Amino acid sequence: MKITKKIADYMGHLGEIAKPFKLRIEGPVDMEQREKQMIALKNLRKIVDDKKYNVEIVADEWCNTLEDIKYFTDNKAGHMVQIKTPDLGGINNIVEAILYCKSNNMGSYQGGTCNETDRSAQICAHIAMATGPDQILAKPGMGVDEGMMIVYNEMQRILALDKLMEV
């Protein structure tokens, strides 16, 4: 617990430096297995919340499947879960994961990997527009511009089509 407090306090310090912006830290610790990871993030979240630090913890490692996402969410292991879209096995599971997080007061980050395709990014944009996660990953690629433009352009297409349907 002593090391957890030190990590939380350091994260709190970083949160102060980041002000006025909110700081989200993905995977501040990486434990040896799912259970240990969940417990560590749960303990970190409690300290961060109790001390009202300007930081949110994003669960990533050991939180891969729909079952994992529900497990971390139910245990409040972090403030947000990174939903790795390629790992969930189907669009239905991505939708369920986002909606589960939202209905259980857990932030949802519709993420993925940098080696996805432009088509998977476009499909994920549709899922995001339908489900409203707190954050989405601009993908594919490691650069910023390409992923941002693919996702942004697809979202603009969705909004334009929606507007046409109103007429």
Features from the language model and the residues they span:
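Catalytic core of soluble alpha/beta enzymes
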Residues: 1-130, 137-155
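Expand to "…catalyze enediolate/carbanion chemistry for C-C bond making/breaking, isomerization
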Residues: 167
